[in-house]
From Swiss-Prot:
GO molecular function: ATP binding; phosphoribosylaminoimidazolesuccinocarboxamide synthase activity
InterPro entries xref list: SAICAR_synt/ADE2_N (IPR028923), SAICAR_synthetase_CS (IPR018236)
Pfam families found in the cross-reference section: SAICAR_synt
GO biological process entries: 'de novo' IMP biosynthetic process
E.C. number: 6.3.2.6
Similarity comment text for this entry: Belongs to the SAICAR synthetase family.
Protein name (Swiss-Prot/TrEMBL): Phosphoribosylaminoimidazole-succinocarboxamide synthase
GO CC terms of this entry: cytoplasm
PANTHER family per UniProt: PHOSPHORIBOSYLAMINOIMIDAZOLE-SUCCINOCARBOXAMIDE SYNTHASE
Catalytic activity: 5-amino-1-(5-phospho-D-ribosyl)imidazole-4-carboxylate + L-aspartate + ATP = (2S)-2-[5-amino-1-(5-phospho-beta-D-ribosyl)imidazole-4-carboxamido]succinate + ADP + phosphate + 2 H(+)
This protein's UniProt keywords: ATP-binding, Ligase, Nucleotide-binding, Purine biosynthesis
Pathway in which this enzyme or protein is active: Purine metabolism; IMP biosynthesis via de novo pathway; 5-amino-1-(5-phospho-D-ribosyl)imidazole-4-carboxamide from 5-amino-1-(5-phospho-D-ribosyl)imidazole-4-carboxylate: step 1/2
Amino acid sequence: MPFCLTETSLPFGKKYKGKVRDTYDLGDQLILVTTDRQSAFDRCLAAVPYKGQVLNLTSVWWFKNTQSIVPNHLIAVPDPNVAIAKKCKIFPVEFVVRGYISGSTSTSLWTQYQKGVREYCGITFPDGLRKNQKLESPVITPTTKETIHDRPISPHEIVAEGWMTQEDWDETSSYALRLFQHGMEVAQQHGLILVDTKYEFGRDAEGRIVLVDEIHTPDSSRYWLFNGYQERFDAGKEPENIDKEFLRLWFVDHCDPYKDEVLPQAPQELIVTLASRYIQLYEMITGESFVYDSNPGPVNDRILHNIQHWLG
């Protein structure tokens, strides 16, 4: 796809390449560039036009929308794909907040519940819950940020194993639940259900706890359509969503994405559909119209120009 941002090459500090974001270290600040890379199975599957812009601007919208709840690391947005952020010391715990019992992966809450697990991450769940049911109140099922696999962990273990102090856990977990409650309310006003999400927190140079990374994006969160949810749940049907799962399924059907060294190229119409779904989600989540880039040149050049202009 022409003008997709898959790689960045910028003359600013040391570069760290993640699955989706490229980070440039300026010392006390970070340049976070969200690319169009579509990741799954621990590898890059494809490039999706405008995906990076959707993720970055969705996060920016939520950062601005939630700063009265908790401060965040955002400093400036010099380009639709770029956020300038404070460098923070990140807590090694991901705050996974769930409003519904759902999921299909091996670590998902519903998969564990189906196996008979009733205590998960220190939370006791009652018998009789059904898949996709709304929980009585949102819960945090934290995971540790480890090199190979993230591990579900209870708040007691987080403190006992030295991942965080009790005081820091109490403050961050309170922020996480308040952010999620606000996110659910805003999503419902926009015709969506915020099903679950993950947050990351850090401590800035002044010692304050701040929200970092991303917030309520289509990559860090699951959204369902609000209209029709209850009727579908009562009928035992899956909720309607605007999902990216179909791209993963295409690769599973056409190769072994875990073992095959070279992956087949996803059909162009699949990529176009995925791009339109990301844009649709952005417009539903934020209630704002998506602004397409009118510059037909390489995205990396545009980003370089905009960052240089911001730096003065």
